[in-house]
Amino acid sequence: YSCPGHTPGEMIFIDSKTRYLFCADACNRNLLLMQSGDHTEGRYVSVEKAAKAMERIVSMKDQYDHVINSHHDYRGFGAPLADYVVDQALECMKKIVDGTAEIREIPDPLQLNATKTVAVYGDVFITYSKEGVYETR
């Protein structure tokens, strides 16, 4: 299934036998929404569009019991995401879109002595650009 968010072409897969949702980078506790580049270049996903994709994942909960993602977030190796992460990611995106998200500056582990701005809801942090909240009309 198409699930734009981390990247425009993000895909998720459900294994109906094991009832696992494999979401790659579409959902985790420290989610980066891909917002570099020009809107027309196909390298951009708004928070608004990512929230719609996340709503789809939530609406499919009757088809999966566990979520496996690509990036490790201090769980035991190979362990699924906590049950609440998908819901918290969606709620965080909704709060970004409606302007009520809790915003924090946190250390950026990818850059020396730098911080990044994130929206926080529960245990979920979402990195996004202020210019990238809404779909262009």
Predicted regions and their residues:
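Accessory terminal helices/loops
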Residues: K52-R137
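Metallo-beta-lactamase
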Residues: S2-P4, P8-Y84
